[in-house]
């Protein structure tokens, strides 16, 4: 045993580990299953999350994407690439933030998460498999805290 820790205890700890920091958390709400990955977002991490999400064998899927911040002069191009990928893969999507708002797309965009929460009060999302992915400052976790999804 390494560090004199029983391997069974290590195994039990790993099996019972549940992330709680908005990094790939899976949360079951009353209506949906939600992957909460809204601690950080950059083009590489968003594309990796989307590639994995599109492989999930669920029929009613929704991506809620928050802006990728701090991209400087490549921001518009990178946000466009993400939305082009989503559109070409026929993934349902809602975006949050002013960066995604600059992209010409057919997806619903809300400048703030509070505006999206207001929209969802009258437009419930049910029986869905949802990916929340965005930069921390967008505060997508408020969708869980407000019981909007």
Listing of model-derived features with the role each one plays in the protein:
Residues 1-149:
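ATP-dependent carboxylate-amine ligase
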């Amino acid at each position: 045993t390494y560090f004199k820790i029983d391997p069974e205890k290590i195994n039990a700890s790993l099996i019972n580990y549940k992330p709680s920091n908005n990094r790939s958390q899976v949360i079951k709400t009353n209506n949906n299953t939600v992957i909460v990955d809204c601690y950080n977002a950059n083009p590489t991490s968003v594309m990796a999350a989307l590639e994995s999400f599109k492989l999930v064998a669920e029929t009613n899927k929704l991506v809620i994407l928050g802006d990728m911040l701090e991209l400087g002069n490549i921001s518009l191009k990178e946000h466009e690439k993400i939305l082009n990928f989503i559109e070409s893969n026929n993934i349902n999507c809602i975006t949050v933030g002013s960066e995604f708002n600059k992209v010409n797309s057919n997806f619903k965009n809300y400048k703030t998460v509070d505006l999206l929460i207001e929209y969802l009060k009258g437009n419930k999302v049910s029986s869905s498999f949802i990916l929340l992915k965005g930069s921390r400052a967008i505060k997508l976790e408020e969708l869980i805290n407000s019981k909007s999804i």
